[in-house]
Amino acid sequence: SCLEAIDELVLEARQIAVDQSSGELENRPTAAQEIKNIYDQILQLANTKLGDTYILSGHQTDTAPFTRDANYNATYHGDDGDKRIIVGDKLDIKVNVTGEDALRSGVDVFDALRDLISGLEDPNPAAGTAQIAAQITPMSNALDQIKAVRAEAASTFTQLETTENQLANFKL
C-alpha cells in the first residue's frame, strides 16, 4: 500500500539521518540528494489516485493532496473529511485516511525531511550536524505515527470484512 511504502521511505530517511549525524562531511551532498529523492517519492505516494480519486485528500478527491515549492515546503490541499460506509442499523465505519492524518497529525513528515535536507546542505559543519541529529527523533515519531494510521486502516478493513461475512451468512 502507499502507506507501507511511505513508512519504508521514512525509515530510510531516518537511517540516513543517523548515519550522517556523526559529522562526516564528504557524503553529505549525496545524502542530501537521497533525502530530496525520498521527499519527492513520499509526495508522489501521498498523491496516489484510485481511479480518478485522490485517496488521501479527504472530501477533496479531485485535488492532489500535496504540492511542494522549490524550497521543499509542502502544502496540504485536502481536508479532514471522513468517508463513511453504512454497515448496519445506525452503524457506519470511517473508511479513509487523510494526508493530514498520515503525514502531519503529530510530526509533519515533510517539514522533518526539509529540515534534514537543510542540515545536510548547511555550510557550517557543526550547525549542520546538530540539525541532522535533531531530525532523528521526529523521524522516529513519524514512523510511529504512520504505523498507527496503518493499523487503523487495517482494523477498518478487518471490520468491513467481518461485516461482509456476517451479511453473507444472514442472507443464507
Which positions does each model-derived feature cover?
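Cysteine-poor, low-complexity segments in flexible/peripheral regions
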Residues: A64-P125
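Amphipathic alpha-helical polymerization modules
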Residues: S1-D62, S118-L172
